[in-house]
Amino acid sequence: MSKAGKITAAISGAFLLLIVVAIILIATFDWNRLKPTINQKVSAELNRPFAIRGDLGVVWERQKQETGWRSWVPWPHVHAEDIILGNPPDIPEVTMVHLPRVEATLAPLALLTKTVWLPWIKLEKPDARLIRLSEKNNNWTFNLANDDNKDANAKPSAWSFRLDNILFDQGRIAIDDKVSKADLEIFVDPLGKPLPFSEVTGSKGKADKEKVGDYVFGLKAQGRYNGEPLTGTGKIGGMLALRGEGTPFPVQADFRSGNTRVAFDGVVNDPMKMGGVDLRLKFSGDSLGDLYELTGVLLPDTPPFETDGRLVAKIDTEKSSVFDYRGFNGRIGDSDIHGSLVYTTGKPRPKLEGDVESRQLRLADLGPLIGVDSGKGAEKSKRSEQKKGEKSVQPAGKVLPYDRFETDKWDVMDADVRFKGRRIEHGSSLPISDLSTHIILKNADLRLQPLKFGMAGGSIAANIHLEGDKKPMQGRADIQARRLKLKELMPDVELMQKTLGEMNGDAELRGSGNSVAALLGNSNGNLKLLMNDGLVSRNLMEIVGLNVGNYIVGAIFGDDEVRVNCAAANLNIANGVARPQIFAFDTENALINVTGTASFASEQLDLTIDPESKGIRIITLRSPLYVRGTFKNPQAGVKAGPLIARGAVAAALATLVTPAAALLALISPSEGEANQCRTILSQMKK
């Protein structure tokens, strides 16, 4: 062999020897010696404790799926046991994540193209604890060591990372959130066989079009949310789908908290950045008010409800997020509801906007909004209030609602919502239709401008203003009732079908207090009512359940059916006490004047009724009548002393020029002389 050949052989032999020695060293190297260095470096980079406390090892294996010369290149198969990741210094708990064992395979040839490629990684029984102490203090936000020293002009790294699959047998996530008062455990299990998105949602065409990933893991949740027990089940996509910006991440869940249920299925867009969601969303429960604790959206207390709609959300935690609940359908009590609502987060307050419609609205289902028993479902609504610490405070013997308006919550959001009710049900007969209102809530200032609805062939329009930012709340109501037909007000009463009369009215009230009773109890304002061409009888009073009216009509007119030409009332209200300027009835037999007071604060009546015969017919009553007692239990009787002199009632009414003129304004010009009240009030003005 020549000298050159010997040198070449020696170099080749030495090179092969080095390779063999390197392979032997790598194969027999105790990788546990690197644990202190790895633990220290990772802990410093993450700014929180990290440790591999168990065995760290590498096994080199050839990959059978590779072909050609690549099949001879061994791949490192790494395993590490008993891994812990701690919390930041300001989180009292020690451990955030614990992994009994992690395995992964690295593709070595990919390093030549500056790619770190892990074909798979397997996690054994991962256990994580997510903690949030305040809005800005949690353990899942990482403050990396070089975050503060990043060069804004630095070029991105030439290296890339690729992960093809994440496997694990069973995982557990514990959530301790002081903000939402959540203390939950979520158990994650592989489904065994991935479920196509379309099989769960029933939207095959849509799923294929959007290339939604399959459901891979099942979820079970238990614990407490906002102090209430919560349980639930669900499904989510694979972990790799989390990083796919173009692939929506599938989610499905069904949660229950008490009697409140929230169920949804759909997708999360750009899940690593939580860019938004597109879900079919269902709610149900004892009261819409219960959803405040779950969603942060302020809604009124109602009878039992359920809704089903589509939620499309665009989420931006830095600026504001938009949650669009589109085309929902459902019910509240026995009333159907439909519409779309948009909830926008942001400063100074989030805002709720949209349109809601009910084709058949049961008026009693609106009862809890104003503190009135809603009938069917009322018990569940009351239990919902008691669960929140809101006990019924209606005193015995009182009629006016005492339930308090929750003004302390009115400043949590603003609202601009329009509501329409096409057909209204109230009891068996009261004819109400076409209810509409524009609800505006801004900085705890609530307005219903306007509130309109049809009633008995006429209309009622109102502007309601409640200043919830004032202590106590200030309230104002301006109400107009026009051309309510008497026979339609009582369609089931045969007697009233004989009349063509109408009722008109105006009310202006101002008050303060946090309930209807309190507002009226110190209210100031005026109430005007005018009725023409009516009928009255003892039988009518009995039908409508007015025992006091039955007594009074019988005392004045006996058992006769009496035509009422005009009934007029102009009441001044001061400090919750109503005093009539005019309160009179002109009938075919008598002219009746009512004086006295009615107190909204004490709900006490103290009225005197003076009748005066008209024409030849003489009424038999020899003394005035009184009505005393409470709104709930009024008592009527005959006052001591004779009736006032004949003609005195008419003379007294004739002096009330200004109140009479105010009542004339209630008569529409189109009615002309057909309205008998016009003639009577015009005579009073002269």
From Swiss-Prot:
Q: What is its main location?
A: membrane
Q: Where is the composition biased (Basic and acidic residues)?
A: 376-391
Intervals, Periplasmic compartment: 28-686
Give the protein family.
Answer: Belongs to the AsmA family.
Q: Where in the cell is it found?
A: Cell inner membrane
Keywords, alphabetical: Cell inner membrane, Cell membrane, Membrane, Transmembrane, Transmembrane helix
Q: What is this protein called?
A: AsmA family protein YhjG
Effects seen without this gene? The mutant does not exhibit growth defects and does not show outer membrane permeability defects.
Q: Which PANTHER family match?
A: ASMA FAMILY PROTEIN YHJG, DUF748 DOMAIN-CONTAINING PROTEIN
User: Which regions span the lipid bilayer?
Assistant: 7-27
